């Protein structure tokens, strides 16, 4: 079924475009809790994201228990966010459900391949982004929390994650106490390549982007600093992050065959 021109043009298109272009992370919330009806609506919307071969390799833990929420905040080093958020969630790559599906037909699926890890990460990411867009369309703020990978073993034990399931990131949602400015992104020319990859353009595009980001960091309304994008990336990526992840994934049944 094709969508009508009236659907893809006009106010709906403009509002969607502006919503997507106005995203910024929110880390301070009023504490007002979101309803179960809202959570179900967001999950149903998230489920309409594309999924590789329709495996739907994702599960979400909605953290409503105060003690578990506090512990998740400690383990991910984001106590304040979880303390004020209206909803706290842990997004997981999930091949356990697929393993059960295979057993229903007398088959042991191959969950522990590098390809399937990539499939799972892609599925969860697409699912989560649909969740985020739906939440922001309702006026909520959100923040992805990669810190959930700081202590994946402890977090897995906290939420009783079985073999073939691992936490990818957490996410907070709620009514913002304030909204941050939108960070300038890389210029389109730096990410869009026509017909072949063009590395030469970075010699001019990256210094220009550094100037843009330096001005943004110096003039934003809070947490001003002197920094450039390339220097931050160099400092961040100069050493291996979370070297324990490979062994943790193996302990969950993903041995990268």
Placement of each model-derived feature along the sequence:
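Acidic, surface-exposed loops and disordered segments
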Residues: 2-257
């Amino acid at each position: 079924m094709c969508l009508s021109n009236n659907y893809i043009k006009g106010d709906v298109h403009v509002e969607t475009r502006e919503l997507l272009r106005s995203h910024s992370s929110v880390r301070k919330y009023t504490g007002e809790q979101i309803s179960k009806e809202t959570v179900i609506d967001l999950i149903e919307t998230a489920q309409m994201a594309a999924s590789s071969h329709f495996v739907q390799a994702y599960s979400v833990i909605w953290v409503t228990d105060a003690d578990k929420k506090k512990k998740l905040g400690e383990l991910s080093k984001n106590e304040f966010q979880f303390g004020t958020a209206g909803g706290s969630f842990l997004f997981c790559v999930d091949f356990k459900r697929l393993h059960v599906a295979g057993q229903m037909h007398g088959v042991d699926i191959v969950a522990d391949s590098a390809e399937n890890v990539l499939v799972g990460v892609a599925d969860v990411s697409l699912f989560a982004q649909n969740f985020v867009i739906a939440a922001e369309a309702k006026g909520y703020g959100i923040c992805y929390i990669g810190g959930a990978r700081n202590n994946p073993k402890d977090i897995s034990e906290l939420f009783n994650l079985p073999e073939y399931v691992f936490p990818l990131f957490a996410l907070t949602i709620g009514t913002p106490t304030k909204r941050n400015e939108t960070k300038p992104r890389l210029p389109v020319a730096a990410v869009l390549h026509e017909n072949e990859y063009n590395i030469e353009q970075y010699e001019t595009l990256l210094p220009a982007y550094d100037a843009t980001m330096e001005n943004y960091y110096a003039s934003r309304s809070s947490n001003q600093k002197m920094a450039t994008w390339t220097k931050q990336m160099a400092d961040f990526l100069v050493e291996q992050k979370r070297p324990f992840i490979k062994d943790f994934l193996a302990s969950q049944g993903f041995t990268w065959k």
